[in-house]
Amino acid sequence: MPAGHLGTKRMGELAELAFMYRAASEGIGVARPYGDSHPYDFLVQHGRRLARVQVKSCFTTQRGYRRMGFPIIVAKHARKGVTLYSPDEIDFIAAFVAPHRAWYVIPVEALKGRKSIRLYPGGKSKRIGAFYEDYREAWQLLKEDKKEKDRQQQDDQASTKSRLSERALQR
C-alpha cells in the first residue's frame, strides 16, 4: 500500500523509523523517550554531544511541489492551537521529504518563529525562499565537533595534571 494511504500518524511513524535508520547509519546514537509527552521525538548522541530532535515529514507527490516547495509544519499542535517549538524544548527539526528521500537537519533557532517552511530538494540552486538548503543532509550538526572534542580532551588533561600536582604538593 502506498504511504499516502496510511494516514498522517502512520506516515509520521515511517518518517521516525527512517530517521532512526539514517542517524544510526551516520554513526549517531538514537534513543526514544518513553511515552509521547515530550516535545521531542528522539535524543541523539555522538561522542559527548546530546541533542533533542523533533521529526517532521512530507510524503506528498502532488504536482507543483517541485516548483512551490514541499510544505513542512514545524510547529506543534497543543490545546492552545498551533504553537512554536522553543530552544528550551528541542535543539533540531529533522525534516524528511519522502519523495526525494531528502533530510534537512535544521537548528530550531534557524526557524526564526515560522510555523511552517517550504523545502526544495529537487533543485540544485537556491531558489527565492529556499532558506534551508544549507541544512540539507546536514547530519554533521548532530555530531560532536572535532574541535570541541579536542578542547574537551585538553581541558580533561589539564584538570588531571592539576589534581596530580595538588596531590604531590600535599605529600
Where is each model-derived feature located?
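Acidic-basic catalytic patches of nuclease active cores, encompassing PD-(D/E)XK
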Residues: 1-33
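Domain-level recognition of nuclease-like catalytic cores that cleave nucleotide substrates
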Residues: 92-126
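Catalytic cores of nucleic-acid endonucleases
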Residues: 56-101
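Conserved catalytic cores of phosphodiester-cleaving nucleases, focusing on short active-site segments
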Residues: 23, 42-44, 49-57
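Short, flexible, glycine/charge-rich loop motifs used to bind or transfer phosphoryl groups or to couple energy/partner
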Residues: 32-33, 42-43, 82-84
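Short, well-ordered alpha-helical microsegments
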Residues: 39-40, 102
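Charged phosphate-binding loop/patch that engages nucleotide di/tri-phosphates or the phosphate backbone
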Residues: 115-162, 166-167, 171
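Catalytic phosphate/metal-binding cores of nucleic-acid and nucleotide-processing enzymes, i.e., regions
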Residues: 33-37, 50, 59
